[in-house]
Amino acid sequence: MTVADPHDAASAAHARPTPAVRVQSVSIRHEGRDTTTPTEVTFDVDPGEVVLLLGPSGCGKSTLALALNGLVPHAVPAELTGTVTVSGMRTAHETVARLSERVAMVFQDPDSQMVTGTLLDEVAFGPENLLLDRAEVLSRAEESLRQVGLWERRGDNPDTLSGGGRQRLAIACALAMKAPVLVLDEPTANLDPAGIDEVYAVLRSLVDGGDHAIVLVEHNLDAAIELVDRVIVLDRTGRLAIQGPTREVLADRVDELMRLGVWLPVALLAALRLRAAGIRLDPLPLTPHELTAALEAQDALPAPAVAGAVDETVATGVARTPPAAEPAVRVTALDLDRGRTRILNGIDVTIDRGSFVAIVGTNGAGKTTLLQAIAGVIRAPAGRIDVLGLDPAKADARTLARTVGFVFQNPEHQFIKSTVAEELAHGPRLQGIPADEVEARVSAMLERFDLQELRDEHPFLLSGGQKRRLSVGTALIDGAPLLALDEPTFGQDRARASELLTLLDGLNAQGTTVLVVTHDLQLVAEHSSHILVLDSGRVAAFGTTASVLASDALDEAGLRRPPLARAFRELERHPSWRSVTRLRDLPSGPTS
């Protein structure tokens, strides 16, 4: 008979570090809501560990993130049951100011945390409030701004930065706090590839030290996958569905994740499609490099469906309407300045009607500015832009709304009403549409975007994904012949993003011209007919999606090919696959 040594148990207890974060049976109910999201969630995060929170849109990921630094329940009206402990401090019993010394936060919307007039002041603001001496404050501010590549712009106003630039600034503010716990909500959503690499390199250096813990809400799994140690998955009700090591969760539980509609690495999605065609990849690859290696190990592969050729069908399989003779958009010698900074420089581009154009470029390249100028959101010099025979610089708001449906990068920038239903109804009412028709359109849009239960909710109280769906609904409801969308899939889970893109594909197939600004180059490869590449405010390339992806234009503009294109471009044994860029070009049924 063997007697357990009590010292062994004590040693095991001492071997495990005290959790940096402990969440125990946490449920959160927002003011005015009947249900809780998240619901009865329990997990720990150890020092030196990176934990990824996954789950469908609206399941409570961002709410849970806000609870980790005490904003829920101290600042956000919500009822929290259970306990959240950070570095030994019960968040319910501490002030947000005190907790900020232990946990730093990067919000889903970086604009919501900007409070000063220069980048240097913004990053110094947090350390100053810790009553640190001036030299330490300035040292932290400089180090953090250099880490995100913004030190040379330290004297600029945050408002002059691009969306991605403001996101990097928010990350610098969090780094300057030197808190042992870092919580990041979609930190790379608006960043170009170089910015993403910089951010994840900084995060890697933090966790390699062993003292920092990171909780990450992120849809770009292709960027995050190599940093993350463990994945926690919430279901649609906000309950904990799965948790475990990264590969164990993503590869071994992939069928459950597919049913939940969460984001997955592109390499894994490709492997699932190939598995359905009888091509066994074991273990399932999670990165482009792993996918390349797995395919190189195959003795033979069937020919890809399209092999990267230019085709005239959208992702839904519907034939595109042939472009009309008259262009949808003509931009001529367009220069635009913001303050003393030139943003657009000599832009000349003509976009055919019925095109689906992705506008891409690094942060600060001028993508959002060009899109806003085309939509008339910002005024360009008269005579420089023609949109379906209309000069946006001269058109009134009602005429513009009939012609161009616009979606802002930040959904909150376009909300002006106090309920979801009223927000949707505003555009049709502005057009003088009869009340019964307005109500019919609103009801249809609420159903289309699964917002029926939220029709009387204030738009600002929606989750990030719900806000995005509402903003897209307001752009679609007037039936404008041209849609201009800035990062339309931001904040959406995979299922919702797929629904939205299928909707845009369908409208495009019927003749609607679609312009999309995005950093998601796999989305570009799958859905766009053309790519417009901007570099430092100039047109670097414009052509069909296949031709631009086959060229060096993206690399030369400081971008990176989509994950699938990167994986297949490196193949040596299967050259017919090197030009594949889209998931739908892969075989998906049994091969003979």
Where are the predicted features?
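The feature captures the beta-strand-to-loop junction immediately N-terminal to the Walker
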Residues: 54-56, 360-362
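Helix-to-loop junction immediately C-terminal to a conserved catalytic motif
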Residues: 69, 375
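Conserved ABC transporter NBD signature motif
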Residues: 77-89, 383-390, 400
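Conserved ABC ATPase "signature" region
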Residues: 135-153, 436-454
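Conserved ABC ATPase signature
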Residues: 157-161, 165, 458-462
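ABC ATPase C-loop
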Residues: 174-175, 475-476
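H-loop/switch region of ABC-family ATPase nucleotide-binding domains
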Residues: 218-219, 518-519
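Conserved beta-strand-loop-alpha-helix hinge in the C-terminal portion
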Residues: 238-270, 538-564
